[in-house]
């Protein structure tokens, strides 16, 4: 959904909001009449059942102000705004066996022997500004700045700054090019900008702890669960930045 308000002909405000929702569930039951591969010729095996769910929702909220003005061949266009994006993922898994009958395929008819739940989330907050200048379609200049803050990085490295600038010169609008009738349009252009990448695990900077099974005891050993580091924290993780330079011309 979106809404737009014009405060004056040159100044407009726009807000956008969108949301994506995903839900999935899967239940399986394998009766004893369907043997598994390692039954060594046994025509029947123990029934098994699983239950899985997965959920995701992602929302994006954007607000921008735009200003456009033309004064005697001088055209100015400016944009400023900010965006917020948030996503959460959840999943569950359960496995059961020990069913005494094939007629009740729900987990509570057996013994749940393992399972887990997972949840993760991330957020991105961004601010942006851009100014474009054009003089009679002959000289063009654009400057932009974007700042992004990502929850995936540590507190000291969450923000990345990404400037860009571009310029263009349409030579065919110059008087000294008018005699060259075989060229309809010729423009020189150059640009420089930084882009960022924050595609790392949601908690890559913090480290994670997970539960693992291990054997405890001697002759009458039991399998128990214990917590141990799954990944080590790295608070120095920061935005990956890529510089792009483009120089060229357009001709027709």
Task: Give the ranges of each region predicted by the language model.
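Short amphipathic helix-turn modules centered on a small-residue break
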Residues: 32-34, 38
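Extracellular/periplasmic, surface-exposed regions of secreted and cell-surface proteins
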Residues: 1-30, 41-252
């Amino acid at each position: 959904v979106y809404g737009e308000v014009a405060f004056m002909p040159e100044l407009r405000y726009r807000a956008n909001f969108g949301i994506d929702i995903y839900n999935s569930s899967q239940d399986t039951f394998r009766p004893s009449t369907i043997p598994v591969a390692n039954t060594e010729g046994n025509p029947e095996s123990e029934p098994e059942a699983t239950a899985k769910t997965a959920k995701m929702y992602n929302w994006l909220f954007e607000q921008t102000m735009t200003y456009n003005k033309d004064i005697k061949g001088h055209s100015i266009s400016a944009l400023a705004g900010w965006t917020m994006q948030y996503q959460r993922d959840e999943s569950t898994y359960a496995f059961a066996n020990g069913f005494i009958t094939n007629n009740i395929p729900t987990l509570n008819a057996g013994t749940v022997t393992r399972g887990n739940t997972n949840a993760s989330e991330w957020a991105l907050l961004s601010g942006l500004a851009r100014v474009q200048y054009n003089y009679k379609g002959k000289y063009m200049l654009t400057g932009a700045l974007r700042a992004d803050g990502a929850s995936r990085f540590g507190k000291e490295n969450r923000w990345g700054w990404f400037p860009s600038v571009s310029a263009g010169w349409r030579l065919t609008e110059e008087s000294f090019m008018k005699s060259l009738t075989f060229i309809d349009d010729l423009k020189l252009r150059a640009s420089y900008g930084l882009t960022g990448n924050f595609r790392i695990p949601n908690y890559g900077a913090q480290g994670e702890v997970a539960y693992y099974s291990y054997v405890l005891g001697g002759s009458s050993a039991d399998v128990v669960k214990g917590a141990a580091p799954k990944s080590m924290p790295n608070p120095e993780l920061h935005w990956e930045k890529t510089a792009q330079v483009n120089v060229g011309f357009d001709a027709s």
